[in-house]
């Protein structure tokens, strides 16, 4: 038997959620007032939160859910469900308008949300809301962290290999309500500062007819999981503190865990995307470091700017961005989509790489033939990469995305934010 030829997976279009209610927009000062008004945080915790916010890279127009913006805040299950439904349905509605795809044509749904796992699932919520066909294939990923968006894309890709002539709808979001922490453990307070409302809906297709209208096609997916190492596994952990308050704890090993996962991921990716001369340099260095003491021979950092025109690096925080820029030797221009997304929208978890791609499109930077690298990392510890090839030049005048009405205001100087 002849091996089955792999089907191209096309990215028809995508949409990122932007809250329409101005009451959900939250400045850093107002965020601190909301936190203080709960009466659950000690003065030293409030001081710590202020310091984190000041150097977080987050701006003054990020979004929080309505239930948290209220005084007193209400973090019940019903409000968590309302938050997620608003984000998910809002993103899908916009995507449907952009693509003109009929709901009856959707054959696969993959959703991911780490902290909110309702019954019925988010994928079932979508089926119910849009009254989709009884034979739609649905998958709901939970607890997989900020890199789960690209895991969802990979799952959809694999399903599209065995289900011909199909559309796959991928939804990536996070629930801020469920992730809120009301205790005083410093390792668990950081998440309160960084994470904000956001979500993305992505339409993938294996239909040959969609090759003419799709924006991109998927060239590579590389997934790395370091969960076998205890320090990596425990670096991001949802748990209860000594007083029984639940939150997500970030350990002191988080940066080293991210570094290990990143190194493993880019080592695999490099073989698929780098020019031959760069591959030879990288391989020679790797062999030399294995033969001799690694401290003697410095690791060679491949020039990924030879492989990609655009970089969409997960908005894990300013410190993470600084380290990624240093490791990958990227210019400020290449880091701009990630830094501006963190500044304007905060850390929207698994959907952040889509806000970054939307930024590139709104700036008119994406041309036919360009290569885009999305890279995200999160709990597990996992690092995942997706490589996209632009099938057309994106005209920003014709685009409608969260940046459209304000793209002229960016970039801004985030040095002091």
What does each model-found stretch correspond to?
Residues 12, 112, 142, 169-174, ...:
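Short beta-strand segments
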Residues 23-24, 120-124, 151-154, 179-185, ...:
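Short acidic, glycine/serine/threonine-rich loops at helix termini
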Residues 8-10, 105, 165-167, 371:
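Residues that mark the start of a beta-strand
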Residues 355-375, 383-403:
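Catalytic phosphate/nucleotide-handling subdomain of diverse soluble enzymes
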Residues 107-114, 140, 311-312:
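Short glycine-rich or small-residue beta-strand-to-loop segments that form or flank ligand, phosphate
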Residues 3-33, 41-50, 54-56, 60-67, ...:
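Hydrophobic pocket-lining "lid/loop/helix" segments that shape and contact the acyl-thioester
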Residues 102-107, 135-137, 307, 333-334, ...:
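Short acidic capping loops at alpha-helix termini that bridge into adjacent secondary structure
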């Amino acid at each position: 038997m002849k091996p089955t030829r792999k089907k191209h997976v096309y990215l028809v279009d995508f949409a990122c959620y932007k809250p329409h209610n101005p009451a959900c927009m939250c400045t850093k000062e107002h965020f601190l007032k909301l936190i203080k008004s709960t009466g659950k945080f000690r003065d030293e915790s409030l001081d710590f939160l202020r310091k984190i916010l000041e150097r977080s890279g987050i701006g003054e127009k990020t979004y929080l859910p309505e239930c948290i913006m209220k005084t007193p805040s209400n973090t019940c299950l019903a409000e968590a469900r309302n938050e997620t439904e608003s984000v998910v349905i809002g993103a899908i509605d916009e995507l449907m308008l952009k693509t003109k795809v009929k709901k009856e044509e959707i054959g696969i749904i993959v959703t991911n949300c780490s902290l909110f796992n309702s019954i019925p699932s988010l994928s079932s919520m979508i089926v119910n809301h849009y009254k989709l066909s009884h034979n739609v294939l649905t998958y709901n990923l939970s607890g997989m962290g900020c890199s789960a968006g690209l895991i969802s894309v990979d799952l959809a890709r694999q399903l599209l290999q065995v289900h011909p002539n199909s559309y796959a709808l991928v939804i990536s979001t996070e629930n801020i309500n469920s992730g809120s922490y009301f205790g005083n453990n410093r390792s668990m307070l950081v998440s309160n500062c960084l994470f904000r409302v956001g979500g993305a809906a992505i339409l993938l297709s294996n239909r040959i007819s969609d090759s003419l209208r799709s924006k991109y096609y998927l060239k590579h997916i590389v997934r790395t999981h370091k969960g076998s190492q205890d320090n990596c596994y425990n670096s991001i952990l949802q748990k209860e503190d000594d007083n029984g308050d639940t939150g997500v704890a970030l350990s002191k090993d988080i940066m080293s865990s991210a570094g290990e996962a990143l190194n493993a991921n880019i080592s695999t990716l490099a073989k698929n995307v780098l020019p031959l001369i760069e591959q030879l340099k990288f391989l020679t260095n790797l062999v030399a470091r294995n033969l001799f003491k690694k401290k003697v021979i410095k690791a060679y950092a491949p020039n990924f700017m030879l492989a990609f025109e655009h970089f969409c690096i997960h908005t894990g925080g300013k410190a993470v961005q600084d380290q990624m820029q240093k490791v990958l030797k990227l210019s400020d221009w290449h880091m701009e989509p990630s830094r501006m997304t963190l500044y304007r929208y905060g850390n929207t978890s698994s959907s952040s790489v889509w806000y970054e791609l939307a930024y590139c499109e709104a700036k008119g930077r994406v041309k036919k033939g360009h290569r885009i690298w999305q890279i995200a990392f999160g709990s597990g510890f996992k690092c995942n990469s997706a490589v996209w090839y632009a099938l057309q030049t994106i005209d920003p005048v014709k685009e409608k995305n969260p940046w459209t009405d304000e793209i002229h205001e960016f970039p801004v100087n985030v040095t002091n934010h």
